[in-house]
Amino acid sequence: MMENTKIDVLGTEYAIKIVKVSECDDLKNNKFCALCNNLTHTILLGDASEEEFFGSMTEEEQEIQMKTTLRHEVIHAFLNESGLQDSAARIEAGWARNEEMVDWFAIQSPKIFKVFKELDIL
């Protein structure tokens, strides 16, 4: 099972907290399995062992679910700390043709992969 920890996201410390969805209004009320809060620099990750919210999964499926979800939230954290949380403007072409986004991934991916490796979520 994953544990609570802290990570460095472009110089900002983010706390990762594994929480029971049933005990976390932010997740439960929004029907989220996780969230990244750029104001508190916290990632809340729902404990996939709660059948009420995640269904019946094997331990392996729970681990895969949590690692996949945590990777998603870590990407949000990197986007937030890069100043892109408010840059959700409409783009004429698909986002994959957005050179700014492609550049961002090219520049930031080594740092993101370092955090993924530290968290053992690759």
At which residue positions do the language-model features occur?
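Metalloprotease/metallohydrolase-associated module, dominated by Zn2+-dependent proteases
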Residues: M1-E61, E81-L122
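Hydrophobic (often cysteine-bearing) scaffold residues that line and stabilize catalytic clefts
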Residues: E63, K67, R71, N98
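Active-site recognition of the HExxH zinc-binding catalytic motif
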Residues: T68-N80
